[in-house]
Amino acid sequence: MKIKTLLLCFFTLIIFNCKNKNYQLSKIEGKQIEVTDSIKTNQSFDSIIKPYRDNLTKDMNAVLSFAPQTYSKTDGELNTAIGNLMADIVYDQGNIVFNKRTNKNIDAVLLNHGGIRSIISKGNITTETAFQVMPFENSIVVVALKGKQLDSMMDYLRHAKRAHPVSGMELKLDKNYNITKALVQGKTIDKNKTYYLATNDYLYDGGDRMRFFKPNDSVYYLNYKIRNAMIDYFKKTDTIRPKIDNRFTQTK
């Protein structure tokens, strides 16, 4: 009997000891580890990446064009020299690809003011300049829209009161931000006509509350990054000369 009792106690202890314990987190401690020059370089690892780093540095520092002055997106009110440059690059470079694929032409371009992330400094324009101005992977998209949807776009622009880059169009506002002139390719917008508007994939998907791109007649993904379009443009342009003009203005 004693043996049975001892065995029962033994197995009872085993069962209770095998139960899962519920551990609870009681404290989290953090420690800041600074990355400084005092950290020694791993020479074996560095020797592997050095050729790639040197190659990348060479490519990024390659001189593509020249800027006779510094261009900033804060320089104008409703249109800026750098914004006009960006929109015109998308218009010119994007149309080369679009026309080749569809035998059609881009009518106008709309980008966003916030998409310009850096100034273009006076002096040499390098590949790195393009990455600084346009660090995002945004690609050019061409959307087929009826004229009545362009009216919605113009209405968006007058309410936004920002220098969103445009090309191929002219928008004029009075002192109360009412539209007094809205032209595409120098002509009044035909509500029933199909226009081909170039933008980027972020805006096409509703970025910056630009919801007038959908629905549409059709959409064309060019698979051509805006940054690459900039690089291609800079390569064939010795000196850039963008300026503020009358494409988007307000009568005071």
What spans do the regions from the language model cover?
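Feature captures C-terminal
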Residues: 21-36, 84-87, 91-109, 113-252
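C-terminal motif of bacterial Sec signal peptides marking the signal peptidase cleavage site
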Residues: 14-17
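Post-signal-peptide N-terminal segment of Sec-exported extracytoplasmic proteins
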Residues: 39-64
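Membrane metalloprotein/metal-transporter helix-bundle signature
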Residues: 36-38, 67-68
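Sec-dependent signal peptide recognition
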Residues: 2-9
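Acidic/histidine-rich, surface-exposed loop or edge segments in extracytoplasmic proteins
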Residues: 59-77, 210-214
